[in-house]
UniProtKB/Swiss-Prot annotation:
The keyword Phosphoprotein does not apply. The lineage of its organism: Eukaryota, Metazoa, Chordata, Craniata, Vertebrata. It is found in: Cytoplasm, Cytoskeleton, Microtubule organizing center, Centrosome; Cytoplasm, Cytoskeleton, Microtubule organizing center, Centrosome, Centriolar satellite; Nucleus; Cell projection, Cilium. It comes from the Eukaryota. This is Centrosomal protein of 290 kDa. One of its GO terms (cellular component) is centriole. It comes from Bos taurus (Bovine). The gene is CEP290.
Length: 1468
């Protein structure tokens, strides 16, 4: 039994172990499966998000190919653009060269004319020299007269030529301005359209932007989505881990349950055995019979049966339970499969959508890869607009400068002419033979008047010729226009005739068909006739019957013959008409060809005539006003001529219409006459045939009826029948012709009616056109009249301006110049006097200041003359002298500042004076140079006069102009140099006060840094003294202001006087000085405020906080050590725990809660300490800086002390040296001041180095208390915030708490097992409990880490808020000021960087911008080409209608050429 029991126990234990192992294995496999599924899903997501290598390589290849293609296209575009640019450049050069050629040719022509005039004059002189054989005196007189006349003639001719050139030039400029205006208008229109397009695009872009913004507002940012995804992944991982842990725990719990059930069963079986054994023992004790054995066995059987029944019931219940579980598992598996399928499909859909989205994104990227962003486009548009505006401005400036240049040239020429006239007058007045010269001039003037009259007559003749030629041209134009109209009409007529010809051909073909049919019919009739003739009348019949039959047949034949004859004639007439029409058409075509050829020959001749006339009209010498008047007259005349032409054309059309109608009427009449004649002829023929027939009939009747018909009779009959047949044929043909003629007549009537309607329509149209043209011409005439009135007004204004100019020029320039020079000299003298007065006043001020200082020092020293020892004086009077020395120092500083300001003003005034003197000297030099140049010019004039006496005045006006131009250029260069010097001086003047100001500020800062403690103590005592000093200084200021006001008044008067010379530099200088002074005052005020704040702050915060920081460090270290110790204790308690009793677990739970509380407390303390540390770290560098400053102060004071001691030693040594009493007194005073300073600084050092005074201690304690209160407030605030955070995060922790409670319940169930007394079972239970506890511990540690992490996050969030609450408002102010200063510096740096960036951007500008510009250029060129084509069409139309149009293309080309090349001014 024992063995069996042992084996039973072993097997049961093995079963238990096997079950546990199998369960564990199955759990592991399930967990592995779940983890694998999760990992596979994660990997699948990664794969879905990623792209395959093949696709990537494909995309890279496509990208590379696209980039290569794009590069090639760009290179090609660049090449094309370069080519087009080169071509345009060459075209422009060609045009400019052509223009230069033309200008050179014109100049050559002018020079030829001039040469011709000179040769004529020379020939006249030679003729006169040869012819005159008079006396010598007379010869000399005549020669001089001839020379003067010839000079004047040549001068007049030169003037004429110059005026011609001017007129041509003005005409060119007028045309150029017109074209430029047109271009500007076109450009404006284009810009407006572009602007409209841009606004539309901008609006669309704004809408799109708004849409995108709305979408963005609705959407989530990428960072948030990425964070959410990561969080989801982490949550999924944690979920999987928790599932794994739950499955493990379930397995453990299942195993424990099974073991408990097995143990219960074993216990029950043992109890039963014990009971059975007891009963057996009792039975044995009672009796040992066989009956008793049987009964016992029976009892045993009964008990076994009962146990079997119970076991069967249990088995059945277990089987039912199993069935239920299997059904439940099947359902769950079905649900799982369905869910997995749904998941699979959802994933598939998601992948497909993701792929589709990626593809769309890639395609969109490819589409919009090269697209420019809106910001860049806006930049480009802005830059374009700016460039265009700059270009327009530059163009305007160019035009203005050119106009000024021309006006100056004209003035110089006028001045030269006047100079020459004046020189002639002066020479005549100087000569003794003045009267003779006057007489000779009088004679010359009379001759010139005669010549003028002749020239006027010639001019009148020329004008008449021009008018005649204009009339001829207008006639030619009229003829050309009429011929063109005729050509057009003939072309139309020819086309109509061609159409008619085609129609007639078709009709003739039809007629041919008809004739063929008729022929066939005639043949049939002939056959019938033959048959009829063949069938003679029956001879059996009586003769009268036979005759009647014969007569009937003859009549029919005659009728047929007549008809055929008529048709034949009508056909012949039609043939003739058609032949005549053909001839006419051929003649018309030939005449048209001839006319066209003649016109082609005439057109170039007329063009040449027009050119000649234009050149002739250009050569006319008239001023601008006359020219404009003439142009207006010409245009009016042209318009009238056009009107006349139009009227003549209308008349011609009317005449043509009347002719056409007459022709139509004549044709109709002819047709009617022809019809009448035909009818008469037919009637005559019919009458003749009837009479003949009657005669023949009577002859037959008269003849005897008896004779038998012979062969002759038969022959006669046959002949008669033939004639009858012929007549019938002719009659039939005539009938057909009649029908045709009637049809033709009807057609002709229809055609004539149509033509009449067309002519009437034409007439109406022409009348309407004529009315419109008349209205237009009237409007143009009115416009031209307005223009005439305006031009007359302009001419009057020009005349008045000319008169004023003449009057202004008549005044002698030398006298004005002298007056100006004298004025300038007087102003200079006044300025020098003012300068001297100011310098005297300044010297007096300085002297007064020094005297006052000396008097104060003497008074100070005279009080202490009695005292011999310096040490005793220092000991007694330190306190008394302290305040006085400080006051004096302050006074000295103020006086120094006042001196510096006065010096600055002095410097500015001296600089102004120097500038004025320099300018005056420069102007005097320039005036001297001008005088010298004038003398040189006079000498050159004299030389030229001598040359002119030898030769005739030809092309020798050029050197003068060249010299003048060189002079002007030199003067301009000098002016530029002077301006640059002025600018430099102004910059230096601005720089000097800035440097002085910076140096002064540095000195003041250093001195005030040394005296910041003493100033606070002595401020109250010094207020009254300062007020007195302020009063004195205000008085001084008022006096100085009065002086300055006087100086300003004098300056204004001087400026008014000097306005004629244009001196305005003083004003600029004064304004700049005032601005600089204002800025200085503002900066001083700001400096003083800042210094006061800094001193206040330093007084408050000059506490050594090193001890506080050290205390905080020690506290931190102690707390950290405590934390470490607590953590170690925790770890020991976790591992070394007694595992026998269930009470320990409760203790452990309580301990854990206490530890958590302690941990929270420690973390809060840690946070506080960290805050304190951060504050200390922030204060550390400031305190270090303070210590450093104090050390430097100490060292500096030591050095000063040593120096003072050295000086004292020297003073003691040189007491008995050969110095005067006042010098010694001064030195003693200075020494006193130095010693007082040293004592003060020593006291300060003692205070600093020694223990803190009671007041400072009290302050420190107060601050400490404040800081503690703030710390407590912070703690409270932090506690509130943490409680808020914990409340918000309580929901998250509730789940973890619930899981913990569930685990604790399971732990309690496990602890019940610990009460079992057996050793093996308790050990296993303890191991399981350990596992469970470790799991719980690990979970709690995780919770703890999470809580710590959350606390740190909250600390980080609340960190900046908590650090703000600093008590000292002044510190905040100083910090604010410092930050403002830093921000200003940063802004400056930022601005500099931005400027550099902008420069770099300008240097490295995008090539796309230039490409856009080149595209615009290309478009512009294409538009120009289109414009040229349209202008050519316009020209053709204008030539057709005889309207003159100036081509805007030519004008634009001229404009471009003038832009590239300077304007070719005419040579005077």
């Amino acid at each position: 039994e024992r063995q069996l029991r042992k084996e039973n126990g072993k097997q049961k234990n093995e079963l238990m172990a096997m079950e546990a192992e199998v369960g564990e294995k199955i759990g592991r496999l399930q967990r592995f499966k779940e983890m694998a599924v999760f990992k596979i899903a994660a990997l699948q997501k990664v794969v879905d998000n990623s792209v395959s290598l093949s696709e990537l390589e494909l995309a890279n290849r496509q990208y590379n190919e696209l980039t290569a293609k794009y590069r090639d296209i760009l290179q090609k575009d660049n090449m094309l653009v370069q080519r087009t640019n080169n071509l345009e450049h060459l075209e422009c050069e060609n045009v400019s060269l052509k223009e230069q050629m033309e200008s050179i040719n014109k100049e050559l022509e002018i020079t030829k004319e001039k040469l011709h005039t000179i040769e004529q004059a020379w020939e006249q002189e030679t003729k006169l020299g040869n012819e005159s054989n008079m006396d010598k005196a007379k010869k000399s007189v005549t020669n001089s007269e001839i020379v003067s006349i010839s000079k004047k003639i040549t001068m007049l001719e030169m003037k004429e030529l110059n005026e011609r050139q001017r007129a041509e030039h003005s005409q060119k400029m007028y045309e150029h301005v017109k074209t430029s205006l047109q271009q500007v208008e076109e450009r404006n229109f284009e810009l407006e359209t572009k602007f409209a397009e841009l606004t539309r695009i901008n609006l669309e872009a704004q809408k799109v932007e708004q849409m995108l913004r709305d979408e963005l507002a609705d959407s989530v940012s990428k960072t948030v989505s990425d964070a959410d995804r990561q969080h989801i992944l982490e949550l999924e991982k944690s979920e999987m881990e928790l599932k794994v842990e739950v499955s493990k725990l379930k397995e453990i719990s299942d195993i424990a349950k099974r073991q408990v059930e097995i143990l219960n069963a074993q216990q029950q079986s043992r109890e039963k055995e014990v009971e059975s054994l007891r009963t057996q023992l009792l039975d044995y004790q009672a009796q040992s019979d066989e009956k008793a054995l049987i009964a016992k066995l029976h009892q045993h059987v009964v008990s076994l049966q009962a146990s079997e029944a119970a076991a069967l019931g249990k088995v059945e219940s277990v089987a039912s339970k199993l069935q239920k579980v299997e059904a439940h598992t099947l359902r769950l598996e079905q649900k799982l499969d369905e869910k997995e399928q749904a998941l699979f499909y959802a994933r598939l859909e998601g992948r497909n959508r993701a792929k589709h989205l990626r593809q769309t994104i890639q395609s969109l990227r490819r589409q919009f890869s090269g697209a420019l962003p809106l910001a860049q486009q806006e930049k480009f548009s802005k830059t374009m607009i700016q460039l265009q505006n700059d270009k327009l401005k530059i163009m305007e400036e160019m035009k203005n400068s050119q106009q000024e240049h021309r006006s100056l040239k004209n003035k110089t020429l006028e001045m030269e002419l006047k100079l020459k006239g004046l020189e002639d007058l002066i020479s005549t007045l100087k000569d003794a033979r003045g009267a003779q010269k006057v007489i000779s001039w009088h004679t010359k003037i009379e001759e010139l008047r005669l010549q003028e009259l002749k020239l006027n007559r010639e001019l009148v003749k020329d004008k008449e010729e021009i008018k005649y030629l204009n009339n001829i041209i207008s006639e030619y134009e009229n003829t050309i226009s009429s011929l063109e109209e005729e050509i057009v009409q003939q072309n139309k007529f020819h086309e109509e005739r061609q159409m008619a010809w085609d129609q007639r051909e078709v009709e003739l073909e039809r007629q041919l068909d008809v004739f063929d049919r008729q022929q066939s019919e005639i043949l049939r009739e002939a056959q019938k006739f033959e048959e009829a003739t063949g069938s003679m009348p029956d001879p059996s019949l009586p003769i009268p019957n036979q005759l009647e039959i014969a007569l009937r047949k003859i009549k029919e034949n005659i009728r047929i013959i007549l008809e055929t004859q008529a048709t034949c004639r009508s056909l012949e007439e039609k043939l003739r008409e058609k032949e005549s029409a053909l001839r006419l058409a051929e003649e018309n075509i030939l005449s048209r060809d001839k006319v066209i050829n003649e016109l082609r020959l005439r057109l170039p001749a007329t063009a040449e005539q027009e050119k000649l006339l234009a050149e002739f009209s250009r050569k006319e010498v008239e001023p601008k006003s006359h020219h404009t008047l003439k142009l207006a007259h010409q245009t009016i005349a042209n318009m009238q001529a056009r009107l006349n032409q139009k009227e003549e054309v209308l008349k011609k059309y009317q005449h043509l219409l009347e002719k056409a109608r007459e022709e139509q009427r004549e044709i109709v009449k002819k047709h009617e006459e022809e019809l009448h004649t035909l009818h008469r002829k037919l009637e005559l023929q019919a009458d003749n045939s009837l009479s003949k027939f009657k005669e023949t009939a009577w002859d037959l009747i008269k003849q005897s009826p008896t004779p038998v018909p012979t062969n002759k009779h038969f022959i006669r009959l046959a002949e008669m029948e033939q004639t009858v047949a012929e007549q019938d044929d002719s009659l039939s043909s005539l009938v057909i012709k009649l029908k045709q003629v009637s049809q033709d007549l009807e057609r002709q009537k229809e055609i004539t009616e149509l033509k009449i309607k067309e002519f009437e329509n034409m007439k109406l149209r022409l009348q309407e056109n004529h009315a419109d043209e008349v209205k237009k011409i009237k409007a143009e005439v009115e416009d031209l009249r307005c223009l005439l009135v305006q031009s007359q007004k302009e001419s009057q204004s020009l005349k008045s301006e000319l008169q004023t100019q003449k009057e202004a020029n008549s005044r002698a320039p030398t006298t004005t110049m002298r007056n100006l020079v004298e004025r300038l000299k007087s102003q200079l003298a006044l300025k020098e006097k003012q300068q001297k007065a100011l310098s005297r006043a300044l010297l007096e001020l300085r002297a007064e200041m020094t005297a006052a200082a000396e008097e104060r020092i003497i008074s100070m020293t005279s009080q202490k003359e009695a005292n011999l020892n310096v040490q005793q004086i220092v000991d007694r009077h330190t306190k008394e002298l302290k305040s006085q020395i400080e006051d004096l120092n302050e006074n000295i500083l103020k006086l120094k500042e006042a001196l510096k300001t006065s010096k600055n003003r002095e410097n500015t005034l001296t600089d102004n004076l120097n500038d004025l003197t320099n300018e005056l000297q420069n102007k005097q030099k320039a005036y001297g140079k001008v005088l010298r140049e004038k003398d040189a010019v006079d000498q050159e004039n004299n030389e030229l006069k001598r040359q002119i006496k030898r030769l005739t005045s030809g092309l020798q006006g050029k050197p003068l102009i060249d010299n003048k131009q060189s002079l002007i250029e030199e003067l301009q260069k000098k002016i530029k140099k002077l301006e640059s010097q002025l600018e430099r001086k102004v910059d230096e003047a601005e720089m000097k006060p800035m440097k002085e100001k910076s140096a002064r500020e540095e000195v003041i800062r250093w001195e005030e840094g040394k005296k910041w403690q003493t100033k606070i103590e002595g401020i109250r005592n010094k207020l009254k003294e300062k007020e007195g000093e302020v009063y004195i200084l205000t008085k001084q200021l008022t006096t100085l202001k009065d002086l300055f006001a006087k100086a300003d008044k004098e300056k204004l008067t001087l400026q008014r006087k000097l306005k004629t010379t244009g001196l305005t530099v003083d004003q600029v200088m004064a304004a700049r000085v005032l601005e600089s002074e204002k800025e200085l005052e503002e900066l001083k005020k700001r400096n003083l405020d800042l210094e006061n704040d800094i001193s206040y702050m330093r007084s408050h915060q000059a506490l050594p906080r090193d001890s506080v920081i050290e205390d905080l460090h020690l506290q931190n270290k102690y707390l950290q050590e405590k934390l470490h110790a607590l953590e170690k204790q925790l770890s020991k308690d976790a591992y070394s725990r007694p595992s026998t009793s269930g009470i320990d677990s409760d203790d452990h739970y309580q301990r854990e809660q206490e530890l958590q509380r302690e941990n929270l407390k420690l973390s809060s303390e840690n946070i506080e300490l960290k805050f304190q540390l951060e504050q200390a770290n922030k204060d550390l560098p400031r305190l270090k800086n303070q210590v450093r400053d104090l050390k430097e102060m100490c060292e500096f004071l030591k050095k000063e002390k040593a120096e003072v001691e050295r000086k004292l030693g020297r003073v003691r040594g040189s007491g008995r040296s050969g110095k005067t009493i006042p010098e010694l007194e001064k030195t003693i005073g200075l020494m006193k001041k130095v010693v007082e300073k040293v004592q003060r600084e020593n006291e300060q050092l003692k205070k600093a180095s020694g223990i803190l005074t009671s007041e400072k201690m009290a302050n420190i304690e107060m601050e400490n208390e404040k800081l503690k209160a703030e710390l407590e407030k912070l703690k409270v605030h932090l506690g509130r915030q943490l409680s808020m955070h914990y409340e918000s995060k309580a929901k998250g922790t509730e789940k973890i708490v619930a899981e913990n409670e569930r685990l604790r319940k399971e732990l309690k169930k496990i602890e019940i097992l610990k009460h079992v007394p057996e050793g093996d079972e308790t050990e296993q239970g303890l191991q399981r409990e350990l596992r469970v506890l470790r799991l719980a511990n690990s979970q709690l540690e995780k919770e703890k880490e999470e809580l710590i992490h959350r606390i740190e996050i909250s600390k980080d969030q609340n960190g900046p808020d908590s650090t703000i609450s600093d008590p000292d408002h002044l510190m905040e102010k100083i910090k604010d000021l410092e930050t403002q200063l830093r921000t200003s510096d940063m802004e400056k740096q930022h601005l500099k960087e931005e400027i550099q960036k902008l420069k770099k951007e300008l240097e490295n500008f995008d090539p796309s911008f230039f490409e856009e510009i080149e595209d615009l250029k290309y478009n512009y060129k294409e538009e120009v080409k289109k414009n040229i084509l349209l202008e050519e069409k316009l020209k053709k139309l204008s030539e057709q209608f005889g309207v003159e149009l100036t081509s805007p293309v030519a004008a634009s080309e001229q404009f471009e050429d003038e832009q590239e090349n300077p304007v070719n001014f005419p040579i005077y």
